[in-house]
């Protein structure tokens, strides 16, 4: 996963590099030329994310474990239709087909005595989704989504024991879509998916539910898209991204702890968890060219992204929580129509983890450093306020729990945040 995060950033920045030079300096209020959001569109994109399998085994003292984790990336094809209901409200439906390698993996290498590997992969699936959005500018749509999701899972092992199964579920999320030029738009969105995998023929003995946290970026071609005076019922605000800003955000995400056992003889990726977080930030952006913005930012976050074990029948529970941390990041973005910024980011990340159990005296906490990278879209709501949707992947140094190398946990995190920023000057 050390390079997989670059998929979303590459899609965002490569699209902005291809924009025409006619998107002039947008620090003054543009004319009220609208955009035609009505009609069919097709799209291609990809994304990155994590999965958490929650396992319940009823005979084992009410055993519930959330959970078994995995991560990876995927590609996606989209077809959809939108209708502009009012000057600012857009509603539509779309279908996506995706293929990828989001997986939980186990590798054991004790050669020449024993070797084994296995993985459970989300290899392909599709969604049928409705969405409704609000035009924060004539060419930038903020939206929420929800619908049906179908996912195929495949178990592959090195000993010839393989199986596959399908699961139905639902998906919820939100995002931003911005016009690039002409018929082309770019969207970035977060989706939470929930699937009931059932009991695998074991009756009430076993129950498995899986959830996914994914970030999607897609380039779309709109057959009826383009500038139109008919849609120009309101003008975009005047905003300059350069300046000092403070912000608040909230989001969802997943953590995956990759386990190295006995110095690497066994590797399991991994132990998963999920949850929500809040965030405050301060940053400064510079205008380095007519449409290019570069900046630095510091964030502090707190939350409950956690792995949970519950043995209610024995009166025992335990959790490992990513409870607070901070990032120091730099970002580079391109300003498109109507004061909308498409950007990539990278920097350092610090995270605190807390292990709590219901047994007095058995607790543990640790700090770890790492790096983070990601991408997002930010749009001006007024001459002082912007809104953004942003994905970050973070990877941290391992922790051996004072085991002398017998066990090491290497955490990585996938988070999506929705935020508001206020420009001070």
Kindly give the residue locations of the regions a language model identified:
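Gram-negative outer-membrane beta-barrel domains
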Residues: 3-9, 14, 20-425
